[in-house]
């Protein structure tokens, strides 16, 4: 038996084991008997919930870039993150790999706790929610270089990932691959953006205690953080009342 044949045989045994672990891990975190958590997950997984956060990020970009062309390039870079992270996944990867979502999985589909009848599309590898949100988060981490904002953006992305697991529309493996792809996309897009805009200086005199290393006012970085916290609190209150 050749070394290649040995590797192939081992990989054939490893894949079912990983799939089994993925299913067990999903069932451990999917759903609950709490209508409150059901509402929280359902609200937080919806894109419209995060519109105020997107607007606040745009305000930060607008307030800290005097060059209109650079502002537009930042918006274009953010759009490229979504295009490469999510659209490529939805149009190419999911139909090619054709891995069932947990809610449609023939093996555990009947055991998945479905919230409000939400099952998602047939295929779930990999998670576009994880890839999209993490690519945007990583791009802004590189762009702004604020520890507070970076932490908030990562929490935002992981919150979205939690909702996908809770709702049972992705396996943990789908999420991990989505996060990995999102990180690579966000990093690639930022350095491409940096290469194209490194000669576009704002001309402002920066004071280190007031600005990040890339020239963003630290007080402006608080805006998305406050909006994120407010959104989470509002969602919790809304889920208690309704």
PLM ranges: what are they?
Residues 53-61, 79-83, 223-238:
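Hydrophobic core of alpha-helical transmembrane segments in multi-pass integral membrane proteins
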Residues 113-242:
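Membrane-embedded catalytic cores of phosphoryl/pyrophosphoryl-handling enzymes
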Residues 1-55, 88-118, 241:
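N-terminal transmembrane-helix/juxtamembrane module of multi-pass inner/ER membrane proteins
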Residues 31-42, 62, 66-70, 74, ...:
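Membrane-helix interfacial "entry" motifs
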Residues 44-60, 76, 129-132, 152:
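Hydrophobic alpha-helical transmembrane segments
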Residues 64-68, 92, 96-101, 144, ...:
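Membrane-interfacial segments
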Residues 76-102, 176, 181:
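Membrane helix-loop-helix hairpins that form the core translocation module of multi-pass transporters
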Residues 59-89, 149:
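Interfacial segments of alpha-helical transmembrane regions
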């Amino acid at each position: 038996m050749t070394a290649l044949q040995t590797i192939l045989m081992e990989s054939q045994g490893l894949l079912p084991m990983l799939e089994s672990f993925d299913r067990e891990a999903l069932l451990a975190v999917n759903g609950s008997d709490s209508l409150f958590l059901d509402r929280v997950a359902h609200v937080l997984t919806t894109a419209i919930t995060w519109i105020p956060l997107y607007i606040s990020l745009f305000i930060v970009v607008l307030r800290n870039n005097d060059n209109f062309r650079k502002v537009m390039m930042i918006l274009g870079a953010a759009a490229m993150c979504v295009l490469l992270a999510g659209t490529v996944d939805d149009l190419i990867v999911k139909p090619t790999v054709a891995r069932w979502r947990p809610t449609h999985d023939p093996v555990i589909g009947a055991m998945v706790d479905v919230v409000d009848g939400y099952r998602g599309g047939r295929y779930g590898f990999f998670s576009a929610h994880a890839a999209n949100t993490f690519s945007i988060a990583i791009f802004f981490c590189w762009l702004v270089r604020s520890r507070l904002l970076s932490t908030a953006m990562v929490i935002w992305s992981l919150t979205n990932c939690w909702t996908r697991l809770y709702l049972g529309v992705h396996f943990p493996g789908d999420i991990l691959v989505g996060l990995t792809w999102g990180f690579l996309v966000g990093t690639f897009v930022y350095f491409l953006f940096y290469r194209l805009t490194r000669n576009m200086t704002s001309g402002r005199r920066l004071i280190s205690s007031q600005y990040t290393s890339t020239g963003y006012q630290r007080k402006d970085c608080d805006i998305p953080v406050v909006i994120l916290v407010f959104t989470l609190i509002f969602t919790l209150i809304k889920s208690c009342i309704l």
